[in-house]
Design a protein with these regions (language model features):
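Membrane-proximal basic amphipathic "stem/tether" segments
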Residues: 1-62
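S-adenosyl-L-methionine-dependent methyltransferase catalytic module, highlighting the catalytic core
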Residues: 122-131, 135, 139-252
């Protein structure tokens, strides 16, 4: 006769095996739930394990730490690249949350085609956070759609080449009687856009966040070599679209 504790241990082991087998069968029947659970576990691991290590390692080895938010596929050398859907080499950073850095520790922050994906209030909080974590003299560069460019599509000065290229690029109906209507609706509603700025509104938000020196540039144009090296859309097939419909602002702490 087996001792009671051995029998109890065997029973628990059997229960665990049965439970795991049942879970495996359920997940096999419902792959959608399996995918959801798997993605959640990977996301938690990325946020709680991978990201803190990436940030710690980068901050230790970098003399002038630079952060890129919403990096996507643009893994820039010498920068801490981050995204809300990061890869193994990117940190998980959500710009609507508190930035995971001490006060006055970063040299530069870049957000290319990012700020329009959050609300105005969330964008302002990000600007405040950027001001907090930038060292004195540190810069934030923001590239984002310019609402005035889309308003201009309804004027007599609208550029036909841009409109044709935009409609073709985004597969909107080229035979529409009012292409500008499709374009401006796309900019305001598609790709997760939440708030599209005018130059006046973006400048005011940056200054309200605490930045004293705020300057506007054309996309791809900057006096800072760090930003010049990493900004990507001004060097791609989207350059002609980017040049017309986007604006860049640099704000110094």
């Amino acid at each position: 006769m087996k001792p009671r504790f051995e029998s109890s241990l065997a029973n628990r082991a059997a229960q665990v095996v049965i439970t795991l087998a049942g879970l495996a069968l359920f997940l096999a029947i419902r792959p959608d739930i399996y995918a959801s659970v798997s993605n959640r576990l990977m996301s938690d691991y990325q946020r709680k394990v991978v990201t803190p290590k990436l940030i710690s390692d980068y901050m230790q080895r970098s003399r002038e730490p630079k952060l890129q938010v919403g990096a996507g596929l643009n893994n820039a050398d010498g920068w801490l690249n981050s995204d809300i859907e990061p890869s193994a080499t990117q940190a998980y950073i959500d710009i609507t949350e508190r930035l995971p850095f001490h006060d006055m520790t970063l040299h530069a922050i870049l957000g290319e085609q990012v700020i329009e994906h959050v609300t105005y209030e969330e964008g302002f909080r990000f600007f405040r956070e950027a001001w907090r974590v930038l060292a004195p003299g540190g810069k934030l560069r923001v590239i984002t759609p310019n609402l005035l460019s889309f308003v201009a599509l309804f004027s007599d000065q609208k550029p036909p080449a841009y409109m044709a290229r935009k409609l073709d690029f985004h597969y909107w109906p080229a035979d529409t009687p009012d292409p500008a209507c499709f374009i401006i609706n796309g900019e305001m509603r598609s790709w997760g856009h939440q708030f599209v700025y005018t130059p006046k509104m973006l400048r005011a938000s940056l200054e309200k966040a605490g930045f004293a020196d705020v300057r506007q540039y054309a996309p791809g144009v900057t006096d800072d070599p760090d930003f010049k090296a990493v900004e990507v859309r001004a060097k791609t097939e989207w350059k002609d679209l980017n040049d017309f419909d986007s604006m860049a602002f640099e704000a110094t702490r």
